[in-house]
């Protein structure tokens, strides 16, 4: 464990923020820098079959150290950080033996407060790694990377019995592209775990069904003084569309297994307006109903418009709930839960109100639930991780490898 913190601080020093709307994968040069660093480290550790694809997927194998027909299992994390907040010049603060109260983030007015983030009350006495209030931290998912790399070192150094262990580090997870170029056949694992979760004990095998909705509204602009019966205000149509979307089914009004409609962006003029929604729901039927609802709203608002004015709606599915795939292989969850209990951790099975690479991989033939990293408040300047949580994640990864070998 001695190098766990060192690894993490090294990885977050690299700016690997991904970028939406870019065709190339990885979408940013910084991701390549981390991928090449990890490739070098994996080779130095003596792993075999170390490959880095042209689309930025890094794979490697820690060979089995015991005989027998032991299934190969995998551990996966992503190298990019969220586009929602800067990942440049990350300056972590290490708060040892947290005693409660507000933590000043850097020299400004930003604080990490238990009033806003009550989970801090549960972390007294632990070592917290925070931001300086200017960037995100990058624990999502560089904590996962550091934990996988450290677990590999522990398996080697302590000669713990294990089968073949596959590891992979992917790009552009935050913009939904990483898993699309993942070669499941080349990875050659029976199942895998993404290490991309949150607080200690979290084990996730349910995620949202997800879709994006892009709405293009074309109006007609004339001088306001002579506009009666002629002007068609695209912004007014956009407002009418949003007024039809259920207000109590938005992200800020929902939790747990509740789905939502989220207006992520809206821009425009009288002549032209564009709206971007995301739709999320755990239930597949409700997910389809939400998509139909958006189509009905667009049709209703667009009824009777002049032929040169129109509303165009495009819906694209992003990913689906992996529960239906992971549930076919209950032993994957059983092993993870047993590993946590063996490490003194009570498993917390909870839904992911989001998505992971594992969701897409599960539908590509690689069942892939999600393990905790020990991090909190991802995608923003209040992000932090506990060193103790990271250490527990390492122990769980090692124990999963050990249990898989023992059960076969």
UniProtKB/Swiss-Prot annotation:
Reaction(s) this enzyme catalyzes, per UniProt: Release of the N-terminal residue from a tripeptide
Binding note for cofactor: Binds 2 Zn(2+) ions per subunit.
GO MF annotation terms: metallopeptidase activity; tripeptide aminopeptidase activity; zinc ion binding
Chief site of localization: cytoplasm
Top-rank EC class of the record's enzyme: hydrolase
Positions annotated to bind Zn(2+) 1: 78, 140, 196
One annotated Gene Ontology cellular component of this protein: cytosol
UniProt cofactor(s): Zn(2+)
UniProt binding sites for Zn(2+) 2: 140, 174, 379
Active site: 80, 173
EC number: 3.4.11.4
Record's keyword terms, sorted: Aminopeptidase, Cytoplasm, Hydrolase, Metal-binding, Metalloprotease, Protease, Zinc
Subcellular location: Cytoplasm
Presence of the UniProt keyword Cell membrane in the record: no
Highest rank taxon of the organism: Bacteria
GO biological-process terms attached to the record: peptide catabolic process; proteolysis
Role according to the record: Cleaves the N-terminal amino acid of tripeptides.
HAMAP family: Aminopeptidase_M20
Family, as annotated: Belongs to the peptidase M20B family.
NCBIfam families in alphabetical order: peptidase-T (TIGR01882), PRK05469.1 (NF003976), PRK13381.1 (NF009920)
Protein name as annotated: Peptidase T
């Amino acid at each position: 464990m001695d190098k766990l913190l060192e690894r993490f601080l090294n990885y977050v020093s690299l700016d690997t923020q991904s970028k939406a709307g870019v065709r190339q994968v990885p979408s940013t040069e910084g991701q390549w820098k981390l991928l090449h660093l990890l490739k070098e480290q994996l080779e130095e550790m003596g792993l075999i079959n170390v490959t880095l694809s042209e689309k930025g997927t890094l794979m490697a194998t820690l060979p089995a150290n015991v005989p027998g027909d032991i299934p190969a299992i995998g551990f996966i994390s992503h190298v990019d950080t969220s586009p929602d907040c800067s990942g440049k010049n990350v300056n972590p603060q290490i708060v040892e033996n947290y005693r409660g109260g507000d933590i000043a983030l850097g020299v400004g007015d930003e604080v990490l407060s238990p009033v806003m983030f009550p989970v801090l009350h549960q972390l007294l006495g632990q070592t917290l790694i925070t931001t300086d209030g200017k960037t995100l931290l990058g624990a999502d998912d560089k904590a996962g990377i550091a934990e996988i790399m450290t677990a590999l070192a522990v398996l080697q150094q302590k000669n713990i019995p294990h089968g073949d262990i596959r590891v992979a580090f992917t790009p552009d997870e935050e913009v939904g592209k990483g898993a699309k170029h993942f070669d499941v056949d080349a990875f050659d694992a029976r199942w895998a775990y993404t290490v991309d979760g949150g607080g200690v004990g979290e084990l996730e095998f349910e995620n949202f069904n997800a879709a994006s909705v892009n709405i293009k509204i074309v109006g007609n602009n004339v001088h306001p003084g002579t506009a009666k019966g002629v002007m068609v205000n695209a912004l007014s149509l956009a407002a009418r569309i949003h007024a039809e979307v259920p207000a109590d089914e938005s992200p800020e009004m929902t939790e747990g297994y509740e789905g939502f409609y989220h207006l992520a962006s809206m821009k425009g003029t009288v002549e032209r307006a564009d709206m971007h929604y995301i739709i999320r729901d755990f239930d597949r039927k409700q997910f389809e109903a939400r998509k139909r609802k958006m189509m009905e709203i667009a049709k209703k608002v667009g009824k009777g418009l002049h032929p040169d004015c129109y509303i165009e709606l495009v819906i694209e599915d992003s990913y689906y709930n992996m529960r239906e795939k992971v549930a076919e292989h209950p032993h994957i969850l059983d092993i993870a839960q047993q590993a946590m209990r063996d490490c003194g951790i009570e498993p917390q099975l909870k839904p992911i109100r989001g998505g992971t690479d594992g969701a897409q991989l599960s539908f590509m033939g690689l069942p892939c639930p999600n393990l905790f990293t020990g991090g909190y408040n991802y995608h923003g300047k209040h992000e932090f991780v506990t060193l103790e949580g990271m250490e527990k994640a390492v122990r769980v990864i090692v124990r999963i490898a050990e249990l898989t070998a023992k059960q076969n």
